[in-house]
């Protein structure tokens, strides 16, 4: 970035004089929460009766003891791995007879070793995962007959089963070799990326449902903000010039629209953040270091049309959620034209997107509540697994056949856990 930037901590000016069409849009959009929407039948599927899952009983050092050591794991955005375990333990989908199971689940919490600042330390995650798989392969016959092809694992970290927070090193490491036949349930989703393999199930990051629901405003509240965003534009500690972080997309948002009265954008995170999103028509969801973030969840739940700025993103539950119908996609290179793009969308298109977002079943797909509720994120994962059935012939190995190489990996990853 050649121009010297104004501090991104300053808030863009609130709307002063808006075009008449925009004011009409606000007037029209205030009552769409109750509008009927079409095209969301698949997210209402009930997976019960369509598959059976066997949950391995592991020593508590792989799961319960880790949470007992640091309860912060229950509220960070990687907590899906914990709550998926709890969901399955009490679900009608669970079977106690492994011989009748369609899928096998290994409850290992690989993102629960946290720094004092709450960031996961994943240096030991590959060793922990390898140890858990060795355990199930020793005491049960089911892993060995498929080498994991009928097993699924929840790996919700930044770059999933690559187990590293920096992309370059995550790509260099690649997906943990012993997981290459398994189905991975992960938040990271980017096309043609070393950390997303074919057949993976992309899910939303964990956002506490009770926290979100505590901030709901009346559905008739007018949407008086045109474009809303709170978050970093520059990661000055890791990328001072702003050209690499978010591939420059966030920096471009700030430099082009910091003085635009239709854009309410800032790095400040107010206490009214959730309420503000419910007063906005569009919520920006740009990539950061990875394509995904909790903003996507928040935008959908709060009925704010997600503006997705992440060229190669693979969105959560994309086989069921009609993302093209509820979101707006803007190419990273087109960010300088963002104002023109958004103001050019016909009012009827915006109202249709808002009507679909207002559907309770749409909001439910983004959440992992406790206890589980019909149509929530847990059920969407189970539906995605059910759609993969029946397993193909290539899932089961011939007697004596081996595919995975247990000696493959870095020297550090091969150490005992």
Curated annotation (Swiss-Prot):
This is Probable glucuronosyltransferase GUT1. It comes from the Eukaryota. GO terms for biological process: cell wall organization; glucuronoxylan biosynthetic process; plant-type secondary cell wall biogenesis; protein glycosylation. Signal peptide: none annotated. GO terms for molecular function: glycosyltransferase activity. The chain crosses the membrane at residues 16-36. Residues 1-15 are cytoplasmic. Residues 37-417 are lumenal. It holds the Pfam family Exostosin_GT47. Its EC number is 2.4.-.-. Glycans are attached at residues 144, 405.
């Amino acid at each position: 970035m050649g121009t010297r930037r104004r501090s991104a901590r300053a808030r863009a000016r609130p709307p002063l004089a808006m075009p008449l069409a925009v004011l009409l849009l606000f007037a029209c959009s205030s009552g769409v929460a109750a509008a009927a929407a079409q095209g969301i039948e698949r997210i209402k599927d009930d997976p019960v009766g369509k598959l059976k899952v066997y949950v391995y009983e592991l020593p508590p050092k792989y799961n319960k003891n880790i949470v007992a050591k640091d309860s912060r794991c229950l509220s960070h955005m990687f907590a899906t791995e914990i709550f998926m375990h709890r969901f399955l333990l009490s679900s009608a989908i669970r079977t106690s007879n492994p011989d009748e199971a369609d899928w096998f689940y290994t409850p290992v919490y690989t993102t629960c070793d946290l720094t004092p600042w709450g960031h996961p330390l994943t240096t030991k995650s590959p060793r922990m995962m390898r140890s858990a798989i060795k355990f199930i392969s020793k005491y049960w016959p089911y892993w060995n007959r498929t080498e994991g092809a009928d097993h699924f694992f929840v790996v919700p970290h930044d770059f999933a089963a690559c187990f590293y927070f920096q992309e370059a090193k995550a790509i260099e490491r690649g997906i943990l070799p012993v997981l290459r036949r398994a189905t991975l349930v992960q938040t990271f989703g980017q096309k043609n990326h070393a950390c997303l393999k074919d057949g993976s199930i992309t899910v939303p990051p964990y956002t506490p449902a009770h926290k979100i629901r505590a901030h709901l405003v009346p559905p008739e509240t007018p949407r008086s903000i045109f474009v809303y965003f709170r978050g970093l534009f520059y990661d000055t500690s890791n990328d001072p010039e702003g050209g690499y972080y978010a591939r420059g997309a966030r920096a471009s948002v700030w430099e082009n629209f910091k003085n635009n009265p239709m854009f309410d954008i800032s790095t400040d995170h107010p206490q009214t953040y959730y309420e503000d999103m419910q007063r906005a028509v569009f919520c920006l969801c740009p990539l950061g270091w990875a394509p995904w973030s909790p903003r996507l969840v928040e935008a959908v739940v709060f009925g704010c049309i997600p503006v997705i700025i992440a060229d190669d993103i693979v969105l959560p539950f994309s086989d069921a959620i009609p993302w093209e119908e509820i979101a707006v996609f803007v190419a990273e290179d087109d960010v300088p034209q963002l104002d023109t793009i958004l103001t050019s969308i016909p009012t009827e298109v915006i109202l249709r997107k808002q009507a679909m977002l207002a559907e309770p079943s749409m909001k439910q797909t983004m959440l992992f509540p406790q206890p589980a509720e019909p149509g929530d994120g847990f059920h969407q994962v189970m539906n995605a697994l059910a759609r993969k059935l029946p397993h193909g012939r290539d899932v089961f190995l011939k007697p004596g056949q081996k595919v995975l190489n247990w000696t493959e990996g870095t020297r550090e990853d091969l150490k005992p856990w």
